[in-house]
C-alpha cells in the first residue's frame, strides 16, 4: 500500500546514536515498519531515483513525523534535508538487483573470501558508492543493474550476481613492434604514435581518473625473420634462441622489458621512455647493424609472436599463489597490435593458450590499431603442420571468442568519421533481378527467410574446390570425393551440411585458383562471384559447430545423429575452414573426427552448443532483454555515430570481459520449458524440415528482423531443450558491421572471474562422458583424539570451507534454475534433490541436504552435506584433452639492461585439472591444522616469505638525504650496547609472535652495567652454517684455533676472558644443525619427525656416554633414522641419584616460596647480591624466583605451565646478578647444571638434556608434579605421551636459539688471515670441536644440533581479532636460529585463511618489529630462480655486476691472493666479495633450500638491510676445483660461459614484493634501490679509485699486525 503521507527528512552523521546505520526510524511514527523492511524514500516531485534503505534499527526518541538518513547517502541521492519525503515499504521482489559491481583497491581478495562477502550481503540494500566491509575486506558498490538498465539502488537477493572489479591488478602490457608500427595509417599518423600517444596516453589518463594502482609490466616484443639457410650462419653464442617455423624460416623472438612490476601514481612519463626505445628498436632486434648475423626482417603483426607473448605472462599468472602479495587482485594481459587482429598461429599453442586462459580466469584484451576489417576478428589462421603436401584448399580458421578485442579510434579519426572506408554490402535486389539470375526455385521455397546465411561456408575455398575438379559432372565427383572422406573420418556432422548432389548443374565460369584465393581478402568479390555460389539447401538435421571454446564431445554427435541416410549426404565437400578443437578428440575407435567449419565472413549466426567454458565469464555482464550479455563497447554503426556525435562516449558504460561471445550474443535460454530431468538429446525436431539458405548477394547478410518463422534457424534452435547459443548479431546489423570500440572498463578495472556460472551438462552427458568418483568425510567424528584446546570445526563450517577451497582453485558455483520440481516419473539428474532450490545457500531444512554443484573446465564437483556427513562427488571427463607441453626459447632484455639480450627458455604447459588431490586437501581441511596432514606442493598452497632485518635507519636516511656514497653501513662494528638492544628487541618481537602479554618491562634484558663492559657479542659476522660465507672484512671473524688461544689467555685475565669465552665455550649456543634427519621441513607427517626428534634429544646421560663416543653430529644423526636404536635404553634410564635430588629440590622449593613471601625485599636484595658462582644451585634458583629482583617469570598463559621464563632472560639475569659469572657461557653452564639436576625443565615438560640460550621456554619444577618420576618408569607410555605433548608444544610456540658469534683476535680482514677461519657446518659441530679439545661433553653438542633444527614450524591461529566466524589457520616456517648478522626468515603457507585477516596479523608483526628496532618485509622467494623454475619469472633476468679485480693485481701476479695457498683462492675471493657487500649494508639471507623444487644451488645470497635488493655470489660455496664454473644462466649456451667463467662479480635482483604498504624510513624511498645500484656498480668498477683504496687499507691492516 503506497501512502501519500509526507514526513520531514533529517540527516545524521555516521556513528550517530552509537550506530552506523544509514536509516533511523521511530517505531511510534511508523508502527507498520519492522526490522529488515525495505523502505523507499523520495521527494514528492523529484526526477531523481528514489532511495531504498533497509531498516536495521528503531529509535524511539526521534522527533515526531521525521525520518533520519545518513548524510553521505543523502548527498549521493540529492535528497534535501528538512524537506518533505514519501516513505513507503516496498516488496524486496520488486526491487531486486540482477547484478552488483563491487570495486576494491590495494587488497588481495581470494575467491573464497569473495563468496563469503557476497553471502554477507544477501538480504540487504545496496546503493551506488556504498562502502561494504566484511572481515577486514573493504569494497565499494559501483554499478547496479536490473535487467539491462543501470539503477541507483536496490535489494540484493540470493540470485543477485556480484561481480568484483579490482583497481589494483597485475597488468602486463605487450606492445607488438611488428613492421606495421613504422607505417602510416589512413589519417597520416604512424601506427606507433597512434598506439603510444593515442591509446596508451588515454589508458594512463583513465587509470588516473579511476584512481587505479595497478602493478604494471610493459614489454615491447617482436619477431625477426633471418634470411638464412642453416643455423651455422649465426654466431655460436646466439644459436640457442634461434628457432625455425613450419615453413623452415629462421627467426628469433625478442622481448624488451620496459618496466617490471611497478606501481606509479603517474604513468605518462613512461611514454617518453617507450618513444626513446622506438628509435633504437631496429638495432636492438638485429634489423640493422647486426654483425655476424644474416639479414633480418621484422615480421608482420599476423606472423608475430602474439600467443607466445601472452603465454609468457600466463607463466607468471599461473603462479599467483607463490610470492603472494597482499595488495593486488586480478590478472590482465593487454596486447597492443598495429594489425587488425588476424594472427597465424600454431594449432597446439592456440589450444593450450585457450585452456590456460579459461581455466585460470585471466582476462586477455587485444587492442588493434588497424582498421576493423569486414570479417570476424580476432581471427586465427592455423598452420597445418601435419602434411605439408596436403592438397586441401583453404586455410583453417578459428575465431577465438575467448579474447576480448577492441579497435582503438584516435582522436583525429573521430573528426573524419563521416566517411568510413569499410565497404558496405550491396542493398537488397528486387525480385526481377533474382529471376534474371536464373535461380532455381527448388533451392528455396518462398516462404522461407531469404537471408539466413549459410552458416559457415568459405566461398572461395568452395569455388576453388569446384573449379579444380575436371570433367563435366562436377557435382558427382564432389559427392564421391566427399563420401570417401566421410568414411575416412567418420565425422561429426557439420551444420552447413550442403547436399551438393541435389544441386543443379553448376555454372561453368572458371577462375584460376590464385584469383579465387585472393578474393578472400577482397570483400567486393563476394558480390561478383555470387552467381556461381549455388548453395543447395542443407538438411535441417544439424549438429553443433564445435565452438572455439567449447569442449563438446564427439561422442554425443555419433549417438544422437546416427540416422545414416541423412548423415551420408550431409558433409560439405572439402571446405577446410574450421575450428581447431575437434582435431584433438582422438577416440578409442581410431577415427579422427572432421573439424567443424568456421567461415570468418559469416560469423553472425553460428549455433554453438553452450559449454562451461563459453559460460565462464557470462555472469560478469548485465543481461539484455533477450537474455544475451551486453557488451557496451560493441556498437552498431548507428549508435556509434550518435554517441560520437553527441560526444557522450561514456567509458564507464563499456562493459564485458574476456568472453567475446561473438557480437552481442549468448541468447542463453529462449525456452523456459526445460525440465531438470530432461534427458532428451538436444536437437529433438525431425530432420525433414528444410531450411533454406539465402545468398549473400541477395540478402545483405542477415538484415532481417528476427522472423517468427518456425523454419528459420534461430527458432528451430531455440526450441531445443538444451540451451544453445545462437550467436546472433543485434537484429538489424550483421555481425561484422558491428563497430567495436575500446573496452575501457575492462582495461581500467578488470573483473575477477565470476563466482557463479549457469552451465550444467544434461544427465545424459554426465552419464556418457564422465567418470564419477566419490568419498565421504565425517568432520566431527574424531573429536576425542584432539588435544583439549584444539578448535573443532562443525560439519557446516567444514562444508562451507570445502566450497571456499574449490572457489579458490578457480571453480565456479553452478546456479541452476529454481522451482521446477522434476516430475517423479523421470529420475532427476543424478538422483539429487531439487538442486539449489534456494539459490546460493540452501539452509539446512529438516531432512534436507545442503548441496552445491561446482564446475571448472570439464570437471564437475558435487558437494553434499547431510546428517553431518559430507559427500564429495567428482565427475571427470572420460576422454580428457591432451594438452601439449611446448618448449619455447626467446631472447630477453630485462628492464635494468639497455641493450643486452640474454637467451632464455621456458615451458608452456597446462596442469590437468583432473589430477588435483582434492581428497588430500579435504582431509587437510578436516584436520584443521593438526599435524596429521601437512601442506604438500601439489595443493598449490598460498605462500609468502618474510625477512626480519636489523633496521639501520640512520645510514639509510643519510643516503636518501643525498649522501654521495652508499658504503657507509659497515663503517664501524655495532657497539655492545646496540647488540644487547637488538637481542632484547628480538626477544620482544618473538614474544609478540607468541602473543605473550608482559608486565612492566623496565629491566627484563638487563643492559650491561659498567662492570661488565668486557662482555661482547661480536658485530655482524656471518654465522657459519651450511649456507654461510665467511665473516666480512674488518670484523672479528674467528677460527677454532684463535678462539682456543684466546681462552687460554683468558684464564689469566678476567677482562679478556669476558671478551672471548662468549664466542667460544658456551655450551648451548644454538646450532645451524647439519644433521640430516632433524629438519622437519615439508615432511609428510610432522608427527613422525616429532617422535624421532625426541628419542634423540631425550636419550639419558647414562646411556649417552656409551652411545656417542665423541662422534660428530653428522655421524650421530644417521643411525637415528630408524628411530629404534635409542628407544631401547629410554626405559631404565633414570638413575636413582637423580630422582633423589629431584625430591630434595622440591622441598627446598616449597620453603623458598614461603620465605620469599614473608621476608622483606631488602634482605632478599642482600641474598641476591651475595650470590656468587660458588653458591648452590638451589640458592640461585631461590633468587631467580624473587618477585622483584628475580627473573621475570611469564604470567600464566593458556598452554604454558606456571613459573615459566625465557632462557635468554635468565642468562642475562645471571650475568648481571651473580658474582663471578661474567659471560653468557658461564651462565649457560649453571643453567645446564640446573637442568641436569631437574630443578628446571623445558616448558613442554620434556626431559631435555640441553639448556638452549635464546627464546626458549623453561619452567621451574615445583612440587605440583611429584609423580613425574614414577610416571616415567614404564618406557612405552611415557614415551608416546611425551612425544605427542612435545610435538604439539612445538607447533604452538615459536622458540629460537641465539647463535653466538666467534671473535677473531685481530683486526685483519678474514680474507687476508694466514689461515682461513674454519667454517663448521653448524654451531653444534663447532661446539664439539671445542669440547673435544677440552675433553668436554661432545654428546651434548650432538644433542644440541638435534634440538635446534634449521627450520621449525608453528601452526598459527590467524584470526587474532575475531574478524570472522571461520577457523583461520596457517603454517609458519621460521629459522631455528637467530644471528645478528643474518636475516631471520619467517614463511607463511596457507590454504584456509581470509587474506585480509592474515594481512592484518602480519601488519601487526610489522609494527611490532619496528618498535623492536627491526624491519619486517615481504621478500621474493628465489629472486635468482631461472625463468623455467617454479619460482622463476620468464621476464625477469638478474643483472650481473662485474668486480674489477684486474686493477688490484700486482705487476706480474696472476691472482689476487698469490701469496697464499692456491686452494684457498676462491674462498678468499668469496670472503673479499662478502666484505664489500657488507660495507654496502648487505646481510646474509639463508633461504631454506628445501622450499625449492630444484637442487639447492648453494650460492651465497644476501639481502640489503632495507629489504629492497638481493645480491648473490654467482658461484657455489664448494671449493673451487679445476672445472669451469658456470654462472646461473638461462641456457647452457656458450655466450654465458664466455663472459662469466672466471669473471668475478655479483648477481643483483630487486625485491618486487616491497610495495608502498611496507615502506618506512628504514626501507628508504622508491629511488633508493637505483641509487644503491649505481653506487655499488661504481665501487666495483673502481670509479674514483674506491676499490683500490679499500684493498690497500685492508693490506695495511694485515701488515700492521704482522710480527
UniProtKB/Swiss-Prot annotation:
<feature type="compositionally biased region" description="Polar residues">
    <location>
        <begin position="696"/>
        <end position="707"/>
    </location>
</feature>
<dbReference type="GO" id="GO:0048471">
    <property type="term" value="C:perinuclear region of cytoplasm"/>
</dbReference>
<feature type="modified residue" description="Phosphoserine; by PIM1">
    <location>
        <position position="1002"/>
    </location>
</feature>
<dbReference type="GO" id="GO:0034198">
    <property type="term" value="P:cellular response to amino acid starvation"/>
</dbReference>
<dbReference type="InterPro" id="IPR045838">
    <property type="entry name" value="DEPDC5_CTD"/>
</dbReference>
<dbReference type="GO" id="GO:1990130">
    <property type="term" value="C:GATOR1 complex"/>
</dbReference>
<dbReference type="GO" id="GO:0005829">
    <property type="term" value="C:cytosol"/>
</dbReference>
<feature type="domain" description="DEP">
    <location>
        <begin position="1187"/>
        <end position="1262"/>
    </location>
</feature>
<feature type="compositionally biased region" description="Polar residues">
    <location>
        <begin position="1135"/>
        <end position="1153"/>
    </location>
</feature>
<feature type="region of interest" description="Disordered">
    <location>
        <begin position="696"/>
        <end position="720"/>
    </location>
</feature>
<feature type="region of interest" description="Disordered">
    <location>
        <begin position="484"/>
        <end position="527"/>
    </location>
</feature>
<dbReference type="InterPro" id="IPR055213">
    <property type="entry name" value="IML1_double_psi_beta_barrel"/>
</dbReference>
<dbReference type="InterPro" id="IPR000591">
    <property type="entry name" value="DEP_dom"/>
</dbReference>
<feature type="compositionally biased region" description="Low complexity">
    <location>
        <begin position="494"/>
        <end position="508"/>
    </location>
</feature>
<dbReference type="Pfam" id="PF19418">
    <property type="entry name" value="DEPDC5_CTD"/>
</dbReference>
<dbReference type="InterPro" id="IPR048255">
    <property type="entry name" value="IML1_N"/>
</dbReference>
<dbReference type="Pfam" id="PF00610">
    <property type="entry name" value="DEP"/>
</dbReference>
<feature type="compositionally biased region" description="Low complexity">
    <location>
        <begin position="1154"/>
        <end position="1165"/>
    </location>
</feature>
<dbReference type="GO" id="GO:0031267">
    <property type="term" value="F:small GTPase binding"/>
</dbReference>
<feature type="region of interest" description="Disordered">
    <location>
        <begin position="427"/>
        <end position="450"/>
    </location>
</feature>
<keyword id="KW-0472">Membrane</keyword>
<keyword id="KW-0832">Ubl conjugation</keyword>
<comment type="similarity">
    <text>Belongs to the IML1 family.</text>
</comment>
<feature type="compositionally biased region" description="Polar residues">
    <location>
        <begin position="518"/>
        <end position="527"/>
    </location>
</feature>
<dbReference type="GO" id="GO:1904262">
    <property type="term" value="P:negative regulation of TORC1 signaling"/>
</dbReference>
<comment type="function">
    <text>As a component of the GATOR1 complex functions as an inhibitor of the amino acid-sensing branch of the mTORC1 pathway. In response to amino acid depletion, the GATOR1 complex has GTPase activating protein (GAP) activity and strongly increases GTP hydrolysis by RagA/RRAGA (or RagB/RRAGB) within heterodimeric Rag complexes, thereby turning them into their inactive GDP-bound form, releasing mTORC1 from lysosomal surface and inhibiting mTORC1 signaling.</text>
</comment>
<comment type="subunit">
    <text>Within the GATOR complex, component of the GATOR1 subcomplex, made of DEPDC5, NPRL2 and NPRL3. GATOR1 mediates the strong interaction of the GATOR complex with small GTPases Rag (RagA/RRAGA, RagB/RRAGB, RagC/RRAGC and/or RagD/RRAGD) heterodimers. Interacts with SAMTOR; interaction is direct and takes place in presence of methionine, leading to inhibit the activity of the GATOR1 complex.</text>
</comment>
<dbReference type="GO" id="GO:0005096">
    <property type="term" value="F:GTPase activator activity"/>
</dbReference>
<dbReference type="InterPro" id="IPR027244">
    <property type="entry name" value="IML1"/>
</dbReference>
<dbReference type="InterPro" id="IPR036390">
    <property type="entry name" value="WH_DNA-bd_sf"/>
</dbReference>
<dbReference type="GO" id="GO:0044877">
    <property type="term" value="F:protein-containing complex binding"/>
</dbReference>
<keyword id="KW-0458">Lysosome</keyword>
<feature type="modified residue" description="Phosphoserine">
    <location>
        <position position="505"/>
    </location>
</feature>
<protein>
    <recommendedName>
        <fullName>GATOR1 complex protein DEPDC5</fullName>
    </recommendedName>
</protein>
<keyword id="KW-0963">Cytoplasm</keyword>
<keyword id="KW-0887">Epilepsy</keyword>
<dbReference type="InterPro" id="IPR036388">
    <property type="entry name" value="WH-like_DNA-bd_sf"/>
</dbReference>
<feature type="compositionally biased region" description="Basic and acidic residues">
    <location>
        <begin position="430"/>
        <end position="439"/>
    </location>
</feature>
<dbReference type="GO" id="GO:0010508">
    <property type="term" value="P:positive regulation of autophagy"/>
</dbReference>
<dbReference type="GO" id="GO:0005764">
    <property type="term" value="C:lysosome"/>
</dbReference>
<keyword id="KW-0225">Disease variant</keyword>
<feature type="modified residue" description="Phosphoserine; by PKB/AKT1 and PIM1">
    <location>
        <position position="1530"/>
    </location>
</feature>
